[in-house]
Amino acid sequence: MSQVHRILNCRGTRIHAVADSPPDQQGPLVVLLHGFPESWYSWRHQIPALAGAGYRVVAIDQRGYGRSSKYRVQKAYRIKELVGDVVGVLDSYGAEQAFVVGHDWGAPVAWTFAWLHPDRCAGVVGISVPFAGRGVIGLPGSPFGERRPSDYHLELAGPGRVWYQDYFAVQDGIITEIEEDLRGWLLGLTYTVSGEGMMAATKAAVDAGVDLESMDPIDVIRAGPLCMAEGARLKDAFVYPETMPAWFTEADLDFYTGEFERSGFGGPLSFYHNIDNDWHDLADQQGKPLTPPALFIGGQYDVGTIWGAQAIERAHEVMPNYRGTHMIADVGHWIQQEAPEETNRLLLDFLGGLRP
């Protein structure tokens, strides 16, 4: 087994893919979809494990990232376009069906692919972000897109505060703060919402007498690092490690830094710009179940898992073939990187139970 870099033509969009497979080049296809601010490299621990278990594995750079196509027009980053890229990957490999696994922004793309194209989806796994219907990202009070995102974000953030997704959608402020120190910004964000960073923040809150157990979920969000005072920078709330964690090395940080030095953030941030557009585009799907076999993997300290608690609790209502929720202890947002062995075990158990 050896990893091969390929450029796929997915309905006119260039998609960079890193592929691996068993020696006989056979086996079910598994497509891996990364989130923000990441890369195919986010799946570096899963690619060999899945290929070694007999699957053809394809980890892509989503459009706007890495060596994949970049578009100036923001509407090119609507979720239906991202789902179209996944369909194009299957077509490039001549696959009628594939298993699709997504983390962070990759999870809504994976879920929506399964929702819109159930005949092409052998099974779907969302990591960190549960299925949220037309809402794309589940939040307390609007787990399945009951509210238009931009309206709800204002209420969620509260007076004088800004929800990070809206800050990202505007782009100017976030790009300015990133470009001041790209490498430092990536390290700060990564560590702040990791298990170590979130555990430290939780301990500090408890030591200060905060009763987190009794707090309203919205108050927890407002007190977190991704809800900002107006005029503040996101990185003002970052915490940094004294030494690099074992799961995220200097070499890993160098890789991500190099990718974004070349690609920039215009495309990735446009995913956030389109959240309202996605809500409108998926209106005709409202109330329709997601029918392929589905699994969710969350982290104890993961912000996406915490925000999506209502969507997770009610997953069986909207996914009749839901195979369960698995929570990994002591990890934060970067679940498959922080806990690769446990993630691989859960993926292989799920895929193995569905394999022809």
UniProtKB/Swiss-Prot annotation:
The active site is at D104 (nucleophile), H333 (proton acceptor). Its EC number is 3.3.2.10. The keyword Hydrolase applies. It catalyses: an epoxide + H2O = an ethanediol. It is an enzyme of class 3 (hydrolase). One of its GO terms (biological process) is response to toxic substance. GO terms for molecular function: epoxide hydrolase activity; protein homodimerization activity. The record marks Y164, Y272 as: Contributes to the formation of an oxyanion binding site for the epoxide oxygen of substrate. Keywords: Detoxification, Hydrolase. Pfam families: Abhydrolase_1. It comes from the Bacteria. Could be involved in detoxification of extraneous host-cell epoxides. Catalyzes the hydrolysis of small aromatic epoxide-containing substrates such as trans-1,3-diphenylpropene oxide, trans and cis-stilbene oxide, and terpenoid epoxide. Homodimer. Belongs to the AB hydrolase superfamily. Epoxide hydrolase family. The keyword Hydrolase applies. This is Epoxide hydrolase B. Residues 28-129 form the AB hydrolase-1 domain. The record marks D302 as: Plays an orienting role for the imidazole group of His-333. SUPFAM superfamilies: alpha/beta-Hydrolases.
